[in-house]
Amino acid sequence: MLSPTNPATPWILAIALVALIVVMVIRASRKDKREYRRFKMLRTTKRRQAMFRRWVLQSFALFGGVSVVLLFLDAQFVPLLLAEVRTVEWIASPITQLILAGVLVVGAIVAVGGIIAARSETEIPSIGDVQALLPRNRAELRWGAALSINAGLVEELLFRLAFPAAIFGITANAIVAIAASIVIFGLLHLYQGVPGIVGSMLLGAVFMAIYLISGSILLAIVIHAFFDLRSLVLIPIVLFKVHLVRQGNGLAPKRPTAAVPAVVKPVDVAEATPTPEAP
């Protein structure tokens, strides 16, 4: 664990952070995009479930592992960054806390109620190229839930704790640390296209605000997981009734979906290449 008073600490953090970011951005710009294109060609649920399972395991290992390594190095900067931000009086005020609570409650009601109200709609707006991620039968729903919960956990630990703390340890600037972490979070959604990148940055800003105002990373994890569960579980169940489909060939639902799952996927392109297979 690096000490904030050690003059070598910023340099060590900078080397570690730059190396990690370069690797992750290269993966996102090359492997993620190519694999996602191939994933969209898969038609059998067996292959889709295998890919979902691989994404869950790889994401947990990669992003969870990076979080552990970075937090081991920069853990002492986590409370320092939070304390710096909360010196802004309105951020830590009880009134802001109440407003946040109200916004979260109303947001949850609108998120769920909007899906229920849209059951009869013929078209649901979407942000980013995310339709292929929708579960298409009961078995795939389980992987949708696993992806959502895993993303909520490892992505919040990485992009709301580990990365901002490391950047703060390098720059001693809370604004730079927060803004850079949000941008990195968005860029790692390259496979969703420009709309997906922008949408992910906006979501990252929301999750960051929840963490900074509440002071609780657990709350940010829960909200992130809830949002992804809405996209990858609730929408397929309510709009497409996929929970009633025991078997399936993996064909896409007839109607487009809504929402941007905030899921970053580590990938293995070679294993994702589809081959002809009977449904």
Model-derived segments and their meaning:
Residues M1-I95, I235-P279:
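N-terminal, membrane-interfacial amphipathic/helix-forming hydrophobic leader that caps
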Residues P10-A14, M51, W55, S59, ...:
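Residue-level signature of transmembrane alpha-helical entry/exit and packing/kink sites
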Residues A19-V22, L62, V66, L70, ...:
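Alpha-helical transmembrane segments of multipass membrane proteins
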Residues Q76-L100, F163-V183:
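Hydrophobic alpha-helical transmembrane segments and immediately flanking/interface helices
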Residues V85-I109, A139-N150, E155:
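C-terminal halves and exits of single transmembrane alpha-helices
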Residues V85-I91, I115-P135:
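Glycine- and small hydrophobic-enriched segments that form the cores of compact globular domains
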Residues G102-P125, E156-F163:
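Transmembrane alpha-helix/helix-exit interface in multi-pass inner-membrane proteins
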Residues I124-P279:
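Transmembrane helix-loop-helix hairpins at the membrane interface
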